Amino acid sequence: MAFAGLKKQINKANQYMTEKMGGAEGTKLDMDFMDMERKTDVTVELVEELQLKTKEFLQPNPTARAKMAAVKGISKLSGQAKSNTYPQPEGLLAECMLTYGKKLGEDNSVFAQALVEFGESLKQMADVKYSLDDNIKQNFLEPLHHMQMKDLKEVMHHRKKLQGRRLDFDCKRRRQAKDDEIRGAEDKFAESLQLAQVGMFNLLENDTEHVSQLVTFAEALYDFHSQCADVLRGLQETLQEKRSEAESRPRNEFVPKTLLDLNLDGGGGGLIDDGTPSHISSSASPLPSPMRSPAKSMAVTPSRQQQPCCQALYDFDPENPGELGFKENDIITLLNRVDDNWYEGAVNGRTGYFPQSYVQVQVPLPNGN
């Protein structure tokens, strides 16, 4: 049985080469079938490209996507389920505004209050964006993936089988095999032709479902932008009120303080009680030129070793997106600890993940890791 199958594969390969190299004529299918094949091939490319571009549309930062993929891969290898969400730009900007608005102090600064209001609004927009992501993934990307893995895969399987049976049928005819062999090959060829035609027709005539998915996508985008517009409208009104409040506040007068106001005596600064410079003896030797203290110079530029860092024990060549490659003895700045076995770090202007076993920590991270 295995020999018969091998012989059939050899015959099909021989027929294929005879058609390509020897100019032999194979069975030609009609123009309608060839047009369905062309449209099916375009659909295969469309579904693949549409999924890719939709994911890029929802998560446009390639570095963030690479980090998420790397963390997901590391979590699978370590057997730890680690949740990792895409950092929405609205959320990052919101965190910045909220942090510094609170540091400025909301009690005495209208600007600080406005920053906090802006940050809260951006935070709401980030939540709306997460809802959009979930909606698109569930109602648009998942149906496309199902279509790719089931419908398209099945149609392409029937087409591949049709090509093989067509070659087998033409080979038997060309070699003038027995009538029953030719008839059996023809029956299988006809069966595959029927399955391939029906599969492609059903795929291409399913416009209602495909357009419905596009409608769902458009509705999700419309809801997202409508909710964001509502948030921004409320924010605009609030900021207008804050501006009016800032304009109506009386301007505080400010008088800079002198050294006397700060209760500093004149002993070390060359000042006497009335604020006039003290007299210096003419016989006194001139003072040397002022020089910068080495200790102060050291304080201005902190040593690199004060930063969390490690030294590479071996060369590490990255195998996955998001990993950081380095050479032996490289000094790597530590940024974060992913888990018990992996660090996130930076070297030579590049950032990424690398295994702990390849390095020796010289200055640990602040949390003791």
From Swiss-Prot:
GO biological process: regulation of synapse structure or activity; synaptic vesicle endocytosis; synaptic vesicle uncoating
The keyword GTP-binding is annotated on this UniProt entry: no
InterPro entries in UniProt: AH/BAR_dom_sf, BAR_dom, Endophilin_A_SH3, Endophilin_SH3RF, SH3-like_dom_sf, SH3_domain
Every BAR domain range: 18-248
Predominant subcellular localization, coarse grouping: cytoplasm
A cellular component term, taken from the record's GO annotations: membrane
Key words of the record: Coiled coil, Cytoplasm, Endocytosis, Membrane, Phosphoprotein, SH3 domain
Disulfide bond residue pairs: none
Annotated region described as Disordered, given as residue ranges: 275-296
Protein localization: Cytoplasm; Membrane
Signal sequence interval, chain numbering: none
Coiled coil: 227-247
Superkingdom in the source lineage: Eukaryota
Known function: Required presynaptically at the neuromuscular junction. Implicated in synaptic vesicle endocytosis.
Name used for this protein in its record: Endophilin-A
